[in-house]
Swiss-Prot record:
Changing residue 82 to T: In strain: ECOR 26, ECOR 27, ECOR 29, ECOR 30, ECOR 33, ECOR 44, ECOR 45, ECOR 47, ECOR 58, ECOR 67, ECOR 68, ECOR 69 and ECOR 71. Induction: By PhoP. One of its GO terms (biological process) is response to antibiotic. InterPro entries: PmrD_dom (IPR044854), PmrD_sf (IPR038679). Pfam families: PmrD. The gene is pmrD. Changing residue 27 to T: In strain: ECOR 46, ECOR 48, ECOR 49 and O2:HN / ECOR 50 / P97 / UPEC. The lineage of its organism: Bacteria, Pseudomonadati, Pseudomonadota, Gammaproteobacteria, Enterobacterales. This is Signal transduction protein PmrD. Interacts with phosphorylated BasR protein to mediate transcriptional induction of BasR-activated genes to induce polymyxin resistance in some natural isolates.
Amino acid sequence: MEWLVKKSCCNKQDNRHVLMLCDAGGAIKMIAEVKSDFAVKVGDLLSPLQNALYCINREKLHTVKVLSASSYSPDEWERQCKVAGKTQ
């Protein structure tokens, strides 16, 4: 399943991003913590590869590794963005 990045918080020191993801219909569904050497921006499309890897905007050389994922809630989003001083 492909995911659209709705919001992103990042910690540039360790290349970790917390992403708010929505489905093709635009409904917010997930919060995912990912690691990537590439910037992940609002509006990017994440397409599945294998082993918890997703490519950014169908560019197979630009990947993110999913570290964790949970169902979306406003409280959980805020908590994860604040953990480790991540900024939006």
